[in-house]
């Protein structure tokens, strides 16, 4: 989660205002610019969204292969490495595509922690699940240990994500 928060802050602040993981944000920016007639900006959002979709699609098939997880992890590492190696500027959209593709694979690889469904690249679902666990902890007296564990898991994930955002934002002048 730390890496996901850091990567979204990095791409938003240094790679043209595009999110690597939060495709909801990219969809919002895409359609806002479409409605406002800013057609020259649409490519940077749509390419990231398409790359994310292709990453989800490819992981569906890769996981069925022998050694599929190793292949997926290798793709993530290679795509992150190449994405960071691309100079800032006109090719930001290519770096963002690589990051979005890799993030999609990451999202597909890690779906649960200790039987709790998680999103490892974004916070909205984890925040919802945290509040559900807090509510259930208060109302469901018989299963408090289970909900306490959920509170710890979701709080840790959210804290890691926002810490990644904070670190990149604080270091942005040095990157």
Language model region names:
Residues 1-175:
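Alpha-helical transmembrane segments of multi-pass membrane proteins
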């Amino acid at each position: 989660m730390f890496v996901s928060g850091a990567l979204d802050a990095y791409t938003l602040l240094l790679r043209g205002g595009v999110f690597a993981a939060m495709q909801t944000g990219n969809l919002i920016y895409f359609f806002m610019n479409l409605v406002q007639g800013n057609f020259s900006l649409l490519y940077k959002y749509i390419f990231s969204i398409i790359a994310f979709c292709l990453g989800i699609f490819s992981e569906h098939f890769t996981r069925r292969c022998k050694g599929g997880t190793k292949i997926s992890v290798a793709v993530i590492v290679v795509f992150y490495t190449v994405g960071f190696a691309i100079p800032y500027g006109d090719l930001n959209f290519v770096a963002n595509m690589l990051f979005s593709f890799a993030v999609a694979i990451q999202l597909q690889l890690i779906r649960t922690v200790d039987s709790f469904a998680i999103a490892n690249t974004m916070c909205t679902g984890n925040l919802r699940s945290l509040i559900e666990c807090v509510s259930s902890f208060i109302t469901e007296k018989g299963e408090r240990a289970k909900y306490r564990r959920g509170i710890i898991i979701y709080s840790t994930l959210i804290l890691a994500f926002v810490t990644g955002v904070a670190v990149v934002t604080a270091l942005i002048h040095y990157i």
